Amino acid sequence: DQGAGATYLEPSASQIGHKESIKDTARVLGRMYDAIEYRGFGQEIIEELAKYAGVPVFNGLTNEFHPTQMLADALTMREHSSKPLNQTAFAYVGDARYNMGNSLLILGAKLGMDVRIGAPESLWPSEGIIAAAHAVAKETGAKITLTENAHEAVNGVGFIHTDVWVSMGEPKEVWQERIDLLKDYRVTPELMAASGNPQVKFMHCLPAFHNRETKVGEWIYETFGLNGVEVT
């Protein structure tokens, strides 16, 4: 939209990490482009790209973090709240170990927000991520809560976030395990009402498994009897 030239390299169009090292790929692309956005898997890949590219490298998504989504989510919460962000509370419920849970925790800490994570303890962010969030919160005044009680997590919040229960690249076999662990963390009308806030908003980075109108959604319904998974 702004007139810049862009090139998309899909996985099959690049030999990065396969026949060509990440370091060499970074050096070549850095000579050809003014900036690079990477969307893939390991955080260590984008960090190596950034080390050797010589141009700005943006994180479009890794297993661990999703900062570009955070820009959109922070803007959305600011636009749809009558309060400044440092007076706003939000909750993330579901599997909090991956990029969305990690990133929302750090985002809220950096912006001085009231951040709630509602998830089984085994699906909380890593100890390192939690420690980093608490360290930032000491500087910004953010409030951080991690709880296994979904209703406690959403009480009084303005926004309820969630994400898919099975992430990119994970096998179908993990669905049953996640459903067993997370069935009490589905975002339902009842959970929204538990916020006690009639103006509470729901947020999801998408795509969401919220009905049977996709192949995966229909397979989940036929296999597990769920019409919608993380939200319904």
From Swiss-Prot:
- Which top EC class is named for this enzyme in its record? transferase
Q: Where is this site: Important for structural integrity?
A: 79
Give the UniProt subcellular location, in the record's own words. Answer: Cytoplasm
| GO cellular component entries | cytoplasm
GO BP field: arginine biosynthetic process via ornithine; citrulline biosynthetic process; L-arginine biosynthetic process
What keywords does the record list, in alphabetical order?
A: Amino-acid biosynthesis, Arginine biosynthesis, Cytoplasm, Transferase
Quote the annotated effect of residue 88 to I: In strain: CCUG 17915L
Q: What is its EC number?
A: 2.1.3.3
Chief location of this protein? cytoplasm
Keyword Transmembrane helix assigned? no
**InterPro entries, sorted:** Asp/Orn_carbamoyltranf_P-bd, Asp/Orn_carbamoylTrfase, Asp/Orn_carbamoylTrfase_sf, Asp_carbamoyltransf_Asp/Orn-bd, Orn/put_carbamltrans
| Highest taxon in the source lineage | Bacteria
Identify the residues that bind L-ornithine: 99, 163, 167-168
Q: List the SUPFAM superfamilies hit by this protein, alphabetically.
A: Aspartate/ornithine carbamoyltransferase
Q: Name one GO molecular function term.
A: ornithine carbamoyltransferase activity
Under which pathway is this protein filed?
Amino-acid biosynthesis; L-arginine biosynthesis; L-arginine from L-ornithine and carbamoyl phosphate: step 1/3
Enumerate the residues binding carbamoyl phosphate.
15, 39, 66-69, 204-207, 232
Catalytic reaction list: carbamoyl phosphate + L-ornithine = L-citrulline + phosphate + H(+)
Q: Which protein family is it in? A: Belongs to the aspartate/ornithine carbamoyltransferase superfamily. OTCase family.
**Protein purpose:** Reversibly catalyzes the transfer of the carbamoyl group from carbamoyl phosphate (CP) to the N(epsilon) atom of ornithine (ORN) to produce L-citrulline.
> How is this protein named in the record?
Ornithine carbamoyltransferase
Organism of origin is Neisseria perflava
List the gene name: argF
